[in-house]
UniProtKB/Swiss-Prot annotation:
CDD domains: beta_tubulin. It comes from Echinococcus multilocularis (Fox tapeworm). GTP binds at Q11, E69, S138, G142, T143, G144, N204, N226. Mg(2+) binds at E69. One of its GO terms (biological process) is microtubule-based process. It is found in: Cytoplasm, Cytoskeleton. Tubulin is the major constituent of microtubules, a cylinder consisting of laterally associated linear protofilaments composed of alpha- and beta-tubulin heterodimers. Microtubules grow by the addition of GTP-tubulin dimers to the microtubule end, where a stabilizing cap forms. Below the cap, tubulin dimers are in GDP-bound state, owing to GTPase activity of alpha-tubulin. Belongs to the tubulin family. The keyword GTP-binding applies. Dimer of alpha and beta chains. A typical microtubule is a hollow water-filled tube with an outer diameter of 25 nm and an inner diameter of 15 nM. Alpha-beta heterodimers associate head-to-tail to form protofilaments running lengthwise along the microtubule wall with the beta-tubulin subunit facing the microtubule plus end conferring a structural polarity. Microtubules usually have 13 protofilaments but different protofilament numbers can be found in some organisms and specialized cells. Residues 430-448 have a biased composition (Acidic residues). This is Tubulin beta-1 chain. The keyword Magnesium applies.
Amino acid sequence: MREIVHIQAGQCGNQIGSKFWEVISDEHGVDPTGSYHGDSDLQLERINVYYSEASGGKYVPRCVLVDLEPGTMDSVRAGPFGQLFRPDNFVFGQSGAGNNWAKGHYTEGAELVESVLDVIRKECESCDCLQGFQMCHSLGGGTGSGMGTLLISKMREEFPDRIMNTFSVMPSPKVSDTVVEPYNATLSIHQLVENTDETFCIDNEALYDICFRTLKLTNPTYGDLNHLVSATMSGVTTCLRFPGQLNADLRKLAVNMVPFPRLHFFMPGFAPLTSRGSQQYRVLTVAELTQQMFDAKNMMAACDPRHGRYLTVAAMFRGRMSMKEVDDQMLNAQNKNSSYFVEWIPNNVKTAVCDIPPRGLKMSVTFMGNTTAIQEIFKRVSEQFTVMFRRKAFLHWYTGEGMDEMEFTEAESNMNDLVSEYQQYQEAGIGDDEEEDEEGVMGEEIDA
């Protein structure tokens, strides 16, 4: 069946990734030793999307763990599901990337990349019909961003026709872990624009907001944030793993979501978000789910969808529900907010429904929006980048690893192009072929 090979790179990627494996192992009834203790045949029907079966009926994740320092790997191995992974699939260096994209992409990471590719090839060979890859990484650090993008471009060469899907943690506007985040992120986005099919932009700040406002957690930990991310990740692939009335896979998703090849940065969301204590006091309706799903408070990227327009949207519903009601509510949402959808893509909402809800909920929905508002993230990073790059601050760390200033300039202009592409489609109407016409039309209106 349609397998997905999961790769997690760097500290952030490994922490989110291991949380994700806890969530889907729970959904499939796989315990920390890899044995199945489920209660339904549905859990096993398509378990081989993410797991391969080893001798003795053990299920082993199709997962490759990569880092340039051993620390995070050790904590994954010592964590609750650490014994689940194939020991050979931990590939790590000793030196660390030190939050330096150039180390991850050109020096330290480049030395390790062949051994990682070997492990990835092994995983792919055990697949029956590989659908694609998903990678978890952050764009602010050194390994996930530098080495992560290096791996993506190498895998693109080797598996050109497979889907490349990334869950990328963007630098946050207020919460910064590293001073050189804007550099690392810009260099990474420069790569992602060219080499991935779908990128889910996740943002720590948006996750913090969800934890504070909606989940009412007074001091959220990274564990809480990662829990939100893994809920989204599990939702995106539900349709592959469980039977449903309307199935979607990564390729269908890409075909429906990406109107222009460069604009494949999605804003994920999840509903219902209820605080852990208050779950049992509510019963959810499809209408409430749909309303919550389009709410800016539920978005996992720190940009406001009301500042842009949706090019396309996909919604993955989970749980037993009436298809008619889902269709009605989705239509209703589009009609009510029609000004937030571009009118030159009719029916730009794709819906999928899967019968199995996540643990602890009767029904839920995972939201993916390809909105022009995502340019806010890129604009923010770009501004920070420009301020530092103008003074050539911190550049010696990168040029010392053999990078050229030209590469920074290219990455910067590529990102600015991306922003203006989003802006252009945000303003485009049905009748305009060119932007000049648009200004002309505006002018006529004023005369009239």
